[in-house]
Amino acid sequence: MTNSSLRPSGRRADQLRDVRITRHYTKHAEGAVLVEFGDTKVICTASVAERVPEFLRERGQGWLTAEYGMLPRATHTRSDREAARGKQTGRTQEIQRLIGRALRAVFDLNALGPRTLHLDCDVIQADGGTRTASITGAFVAAHDAVTKLVAAGRIARSPITDYVAAISVGVFGGTPVLDLDYDEDSACDTDMNVVMTGAGGFVEVQGTAEGAPFSRTEMNALLDLAQAGIGELVRLQRAALEA
């Protein structure tokens, strides 16, 4: 998978975009990250609230939830704010639930105690892969937030059990490729989003044949690409948190 002429960006089929993770991007939230997957840029914040949803009252455990949104001009043409329309789109609800599920997969909510960690992922520029960038950045923001809780003595230990990151893969021009940008995503035959832990466990796989159905062989190739890409993202998360 070394053919770079296949992809509009000139990347190899197995090559991520340039990924940057900038911590402490804003000053108020307990965790605040700017994550960049090429030209896709997302601000991810983690905020701690000393309360839990009603269904968790008196159970002593915590909760983690996520919200996702896009600025009106994050894409090629301006879109109205969802608040102005009075409701969230189905896509927005799907993505924020995915982010929440992905992060809860690596959290011991009992260790978090009776508090809620709110993750807010705001896309300031979109060029494909906003949900996968959000998950990858939100983990780092959440890690910073719980580190502060431990340092302040509000919890005895970190509730984080592993790393988690996400990446898109797809079949573009008949070839499995890693980390689709907008040009590839809008023209691919297959689009798949994969969420995995640092230990290599699958948290979620979302795959759709946009054009021709994909074979089991292609699916295996896509998952291999995703696993390698997520391994690199976890390395970048570790490096950011150790900086």
Curated annotation (Swiss-Prot):
Which Gene3D superfamilies does its entry note?
A: GHMP Kinase, N-terminal domain
**What reaction gets catalysed by this protein?**
tRNA(n+1) + phosphate = tRNA(n) + a ribonucleoside 5'-diphosphate
The entry assigns this protein to a family as follows: Belongs to the RNase PH family.
MF terms (GO), sorted A to Z = 3'-5'-RNA exonuclease activity; tRNA binding; tRNA nucleotidyltransferase activity
* SUPFAM superfamilies xref list: Ribonuclease PH domain 2-like (SSF55666), Ribosomal protein S5 domain 2-like (SSF54211)
Source gene? Answer: rph
Organism, by scientific name, is: Burkholderia mallei (strain ATCC 23344)
Keywords of the record: Nucleotidyltransferase, RNA-binding, rRNA processing, Transferase, tRNA processing, tRNA-binding
Q: What is this protein called?
A: Ribonuclease PH
Briefly, what is this protein's role? Phosphorolytic 3'-5' exoribonuclease that plays an important role in tRNA 3'-end maturation. Removes nucleotide residues following the 3'-CCA terminus of tRNAs; can also add nucleotides to the ends of RNA molecules by using nucleoside diphosphates as substrates, but this may not be physiologically important. Probably plays a role in initiation of 16S rRNA degradation (leading to ribosome degradation) during starvation.
UniProt keyword Transferase, yes or no: yes
Q: What is its EC number?
A: 2.7.7.56
